[in-house]
Amino acid sequence: MDIDPYKEFGASVELLSFLPSDFFPSVRDLLDTASALYREALESPEHCSPHHTALRQAILCWGELMNLATWVGSNLEDPASRELVVSYVNVNMGLKIRQLLWFHISCLTFGRETVLEYLVSFGVWIRTPPAYRPPNAPILSTLPETTVVRRRGRSPRRRTPSPRRRRSQSPRRRRSQSRESQC
C-alpha cells in the first residue's frame, strides 16, 4: 500500500521532501512545542481537528518506537547490529516523525493554507537554479497573510474604524481563539 499521510491535508510526502532533513527540529523539540502549545487539546477526549488527531497518532507512534528501541538496546547483544538498528531508526523513522510533527504543529500554528503556500514557495525556490533565485529561502513565519485573505474573496482589514461607526464599550472579540482552547 502506498499511503501518503499528508494527502487529506492537501500536501504530499513529495512536497515535504523539498525541505532538507536538517530543516526539521529534533523530535524532542517538536514534542515540547506540541505540549506547550496544544497539550490541553491533545489530552482532551473531544475531537478538535484532524491535525490534532494526526499529532496524537504521531506522538503515540514515536512512543512505541522508543519502546522498541529500548527493547532492542537491551536484547541485541551485538554492538554493531545494535548500532545499525539505532541508526536506521534515527535516520529514516525519526525523519518521518519529525516531518509529521512539524507539518501538523505548523498547520495548527500558522494555518494549513499558509503552510501549503510555504511548501510550494520553498519547492519552487529550491528547484530554481541559484543564479536565478533570491539568496534567501522563503520563511514560514514571514509569508504575507494577505494572500490567504484575498484567496477567500475578502479585502484586507482596515487598520482604523470608520468614523461613522460608534465604538462599542466592551472589548472587541478576537476572531481566532487563544492557544489554550485551540479546538
Swiss-Prot record:
Main location as per UniProt: virion
Region (Disordered): 136-183
Modifications made to the protein after synthesis: Phosphorylated by host SRPK1, SRPK2, and maybe protein kinase C or GAPDH. Phosphorylation is critical for pregenomic RNA packaging. Protein kinase C phosphorylation is stimulated by HBx protein and may play a role in transport of the viral genome to the nucleus at the late step during the viral replication cycle.
One GO cellular component term: T=4 icosahedral viral capsid
Sequence repeat boundaries on the chain: 155-161, 162-169, 170-177
Region of interest called 3 X 8 AA repeats of S-P-R-R-R-[PR]-S-Q, as start-end residue ranges on this chain: 155-177
Chain residue ranges for the region called RNA binding: 177-183
Sites of Phosphoserine modification: 155, 162, 170
Pfam families: Hepatitis_core
One BP term from GO: symbiont entry into host cell
Localization: Virion; Host cytoplasm
Regions of compositional bias (Basic residues) in chain numbering: 149-176
UniProt keyword list: Capsid protein, Cytoplasmic inwards viral transport, DNA-binding, Host cytoplasm, Host-virus interaction, Microtubular inwards viral transport, Phosphoprotein, Repeat, RNA-binding, T=4 icosahedral capsid protein, Viral penetration into host nucleus, Virion, Virus entry into host cell
Gene Ontology MF annotations: DNA binding; RNA binding; structural molecule activity
Residue interval(s) of motif Bipartite nuclear localization signal: 158-175
Subunit record text: Homodimerizes, then multimerizes. Interacts with cytosol exposed regions of viral L glycoprotein present in the reticulum-to-Golgi compartment. Interacts with human FLNB. Phosphorylated form interacts with host importin alpha; this interaction depends on the exposure of the NLS, which itself depends upon genome maturation and/or phosphorylation of the capsid protein. Interacts with host NUP153.
Role noted for this protein: Self assembles to form an icosahedral capsid. Most capsids appear to be large particles with an icosahedral symmetry of T=4 and consist of 240 copies of capsid protein, though a fraction forms smaller T=3 particles consisting of 180 capsid proteins. Entering capsids are transported along microtubules to the nucleus. Phosphorylation of the capsid is thought to induce exposure of nuclear localization signal in the C-terminal portion of the capsid protein that allows binding to the nuclear pore complex via the importin (karyopherin-) alpha and beta.
Family statement drawn from the similarity comment of this UniProt entry: Belongs to the orthohepadnavirus core antigen family.
Protein name as it appears in the record: Capsid protein
Organism, as annotated: Hepatitis B virus genotype B/C subtype adw (isolate Okinawa/pODW282/1998)
Lineage: Viruses, Riboviria, Pararnavirae, Artverviricota, Revtraviricetes
